[in-house]
Amino acid sequence: MALPIIIDCDPGHDDAIALVLALASPELEVKAITSSAGNQTPEKTLRNVLRMLTLLKRPDIPVAGGAVKPLMRELIIADNVHGESGLNGPALPEPSFAPQSGTAVELMAKTLRESAQPVTIVSTGPQTNVALLLNSHPELHTKIARIVIMGGAMALGNWTPAAEFNIYVDPEAAEIVFQSGIPVVMAGLDVTHKAQIHAADIERFRAIGNPISTIVAELLDFFMEYHKDEKWGFVGAPLHDPCTIAWLLKPEIFTTVERWVGVETKGKYTQGMTVVDYYFLTGNKPNATVMVDVDRQGFVDLLAERLQYYA
């Protein structure tokens, strides 16, 4: 039986590729997609979900827009990474269908209520929508199998020296998610910076030759430019968000540890930092499965294999 999932995302190049991977995988049943504000403004990320589903010919999947700003802060966006549209690079279609009239939280709650089995929530943007769901519907916590997030880092940040972007945008929301008691799987920068796509991998995807693999290659062409900055020391571009979907499909290509994670919401220098109790110093019981390594070639091979689905 396919694993039921809800995807909450803020497309964003890597979010878009995570959608491509999920919808090419019969092991997963994508029951709903909600948009969050993060990589771009809420209007643009919602539009980008609709554009991607139009491209992938999946107007059957319910879509709803989420919160327009973080729980307690003003919105920060990453237009320097993802461009003015949030998906700069390829020519994507205009949406062929409209989102549902309700909110992301309403769609998530409805999906959980109606599911015969617990649902996995995959969150590849700030945690605002998921935190609002958890706070407003405590009766539905048992309907959530786990929450798989792209966010955080044990070591170095990518938006501040201490903080990864998704967590930094809404640290209060992330803290709610980590302390919810629901199993959390964290794909942080420690693993996603190892899931780099090299120039040769992009050409491999392009050579598959179907319309979707071509679009993915063009998304990566644009995404690669930001990551060529020497300060990162990257060979390619880290493909953050697809690590969440890849873990669901092939957990064996990832190395994980069970640890307690908290989010710093007030630090002068460390606001938005995910504090991972790696050496069990706090006495707190682990609340997260933390990805720490990935078989990069296995990750690339999985993407290439699933892009064949669109032939």
UniProtKB/Swiss-Prot annotation:
Keywords from the UniProt entry: Glycosidase, Hydrolase
Signal peptide from the UniProt entry: none
Record InterPro entries: I/U_nuclsd_hydro_CS, Inosine/uridine_hydrolase_dom, IUNH, Pyrim_hydro_RihA, Ribo_hydro-like
Classification via Gene3D superfamilies: Ribonucleoside hydrolase-like
Matches recorded under SUPFAM superfamilies: Nucleoside hydrolase (SSF53590)
An example Gene Ontology molecular-function term: uridine nucleosidase activity
GO cellular component, one term: cytosol
GO annotation terms (biological process): nucleobase-containing small molecule interconversion; purine nucleoside catabolic process; pyrimidine nucleobase metabolic process
Pfam family, any one: IU_nuc_hydro
Top enzyme category: hydrolase
Catalytic center residues: H240
Enzyme Commission no: 3.2.-.-
Domain of life where this protein originates: Bacteria
PANTHER family the record matches: INOSINE-URIDINE PREFERRING NUCLEOSIDE HYDROLASE, URIDINE NUCLEOSIDASE
Family from the record: Belongs to the IUNH family. RihA subfamily.
Its job: Hydrolyzes cytidine or uridine to ribose and cytosine or uracil, respectively.
UniProt name for this protein: Pyrimidine-specific ribonucleoside hydrolase RihA
Organism: Salmonella enteritidis PT4 (strain P125109)
Gene: rihA
